[in-house]
Amino acid sequence: MGKTVVIKCGGSVLDELSPAFFASVRTMREQGMDVVIVHGGGPEIGQMLKKLAVPSEFVNGLRKTTKEVLAVVEMVLSGKVNKQLVAMLRQNGLPAVGVSGVDGGLLEAEPIDFAKLGYVGRVKTVRSRLLRTLLEAGYIPVVSPLGIDQNGQTYNINADTAAGAVAAAIGASQLAFVTNVPGILRDGALVAEATAETIERLIEDGVITGGMIPKVKAALSALSDALPEVMIVSGKTTFYQNGTWHGTTIRKEVGVYL
């Protein structure tokens, strides 16, 4: 296999994915890259919990997951959102196969803090053989962020951290977080590059706010010697063309504050 790119699509951006997004994915494949997509589904989960009158709360930014909440999370992520995204990819000429982190024990999980969060898990191990098998057969694996432990208990996993774990396990050359903006913006202009140091300053200065904060923190935590840079890109426009990425590049090394 050649280079592998992991793309993380947040639940809030799935309805806004444009033809340009799918064209970017097609370009990658035409250039010999393998693509794995990990998706979220927070807004859809919230709507379904409300519709079914299942009580839910957030603790430190994570959805406390009772057995009742977990049943809805599984239904929405694997039964609805995953299949919708697979259908969208196929409509755009991209051969996709939807899997859950439970399938084949792909994402082995353990509870983060059962007393506080219930069935919210962290990825303990990624069994990447299933992904490699699908990639070698020419498919784009589309992964819903559910995990399973050795006793067969399923867990709700944060999609950003799941994407980072998958990228590390398969030796991805790039990890891209897809949002509804072109990247980190300052006064409406794109911040082309950022490091941990510059990101902390941008947060302090109120440049990075709201939902972008957990995105950039997840991007920073995904950085390693094997994955020295991560992208934040838009799902509304072309983010990869002619071998060039369009968005904010987040790197490990110290850079200049922009």
Swiss-Prot record:
Its main location: cytoplasm. The gene is argB. It catalyses: N-acetyl-L-glutamate + ATP = N-acetyl-L-glutamyl 5-phosphate + ADP. It comes from the Bacteria. Keywords: Amino-acid biosynthesis, Arginine biosynthesis, ATP-binding, Cytoplasm, Kinase, Nucleotide-binding, Transferase. Its EC number is 2.7.2.8. It is an enzyme of class 2 (transferase). This is Acetylglutamate kinase. The keyword Cytoplasm applies.
